């Protein structure tokens, strides 16, 4: 179940992350598999099999009844024993650091009164994903402060991050980063019976206040631009396939070279002139103020319903076939005349996307 009521139709993974769409997170995990996901959790420091005292992940071998090896826990978070803010922040820092994970440390060095270094811990690091993948994730997460977490925005420095809440808003998270630092905030109680207020953006607001203090005096800065191994393509928001640039229903999206789509979407659309007063096709007497130009997407084959009756509205609601019977007085032409401007055979607004 998503946090919102209703159905929003087909959503890209970018939209799903920005809008916290739970269903698509679960579907993605289902596609890649539990074992593959576990490998990435290990890489990002969220599972530590070498140190049981530092590992909060519960495997199926540890507990058959209560474990984290399921679609709910691994896709949506809020694991059986939870995850510490330190670990979560360390994982996000790897995205900020071009895919390189730096093991969190509490100090950089200890010196005596003469400046001699007494202690200087070695900070372990490893590559957990490519810098190209890290760039795309940074770019996607830049959309969150513009949508769900506006309290985290900074006036001159770019911010990427992600909100997080648990059932009944018992926990509120925001973990994010700038070109300078990665910060994690969590608001909640040790007693899980205590609920927070309905303001699920409170952690983002707190994060924004802390971030502004930390960045005080820092010059304006944006994230590094994409490398030459990143390309941008205009793709359909419905299928993810290529579309002609400038046609409706598409967005520009980044891809790692070699992973971009090569086929064009087979959907096409027709623009119909609709009489806003009754939802029927406008006739030759319909005044401009009553006309709405409405785009209908047509699929090569009929939409097939799944387990529910939910479907993308464009796919199941075909354009109207009846002509409006309302005749506007300053034009006496028969609205059902063969020369009606909405006759499909004469429609000049077809835009085939091949």
Question: Predicted segment positions?
Answer:
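A penicillin-recognizing enzyme superfamily signal
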Residues: 15, 82-267
């Amino acid at each position: 179940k998503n946090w919102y009521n209703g159905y929003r139709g087909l959503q890209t993974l970018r939209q799903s992350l920005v809008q916290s769409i739970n269903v698509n997170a679960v579907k993605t995990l289902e596609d890649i598999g539990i074992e593959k996901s576990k490998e990435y959790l290990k890489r990002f420091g969220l599972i530590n099999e070498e140190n049981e005292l530092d590992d909060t992940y519960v495997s199926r071998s540890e507990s058959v009844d209560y474990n984290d090896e399921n679609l709910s826990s691994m896709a949506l978070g809020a694991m059986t024993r939870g995850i510490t803010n330190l670990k979560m922040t360390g994982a996000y820092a790897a995205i900020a650091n071009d895919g390189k994970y730096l093991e969190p440390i509490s100090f950089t060095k200890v010196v005596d009164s003469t400046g001699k270094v007494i202690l200087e811990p070695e900070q372990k690091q490893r590559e957990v994903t490519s810098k190209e993948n890290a760039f795309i994730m940074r770019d996607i997460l830049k959309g969150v402060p513009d949508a769900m977490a506006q309290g985290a925005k900074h006036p001159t420095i770019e911010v990427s991050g992600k909100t997080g809440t648990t059932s009944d808003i018992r926990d509120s998270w925001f973990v994010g980063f700038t070109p300078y630092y990665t910060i994690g905030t969590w608001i909640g109680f040790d007693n899980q019976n205590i609920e927070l207020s309905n303001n699920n953006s409170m952690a983002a607001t707190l994060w924004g206040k802390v971030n502004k203090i930390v960045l005080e005096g820092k010059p304006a800065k944006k994230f590094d631009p994409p490398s030459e191994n990143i390309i941008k393509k205009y793709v359909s928001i419905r299928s993810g396939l290529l579309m002609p640039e400038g046609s409706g229903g598409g967005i520009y999206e980044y891809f790692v070279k070699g992973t971009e789509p090569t086929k064009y979407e087979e959907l096409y659309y027709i623009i119909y002139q609709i009489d806003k007063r009754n939802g029927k096709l406008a006739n030759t007497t319909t005044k401009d103020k009553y006309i709405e130009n409405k785009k209908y997407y047509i699929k090569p084959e009929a939409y097939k319903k799944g387990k529910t009756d939910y479907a993308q509205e464009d796919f199941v609601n075909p354009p109207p076939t009846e002509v409006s019977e309302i005749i506007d007085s300053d034009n006496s032409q028969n609205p059902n005349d063969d020369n009606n401007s909405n006759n499909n055979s004469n429609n000049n607004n077809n835009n085939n996307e091949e």
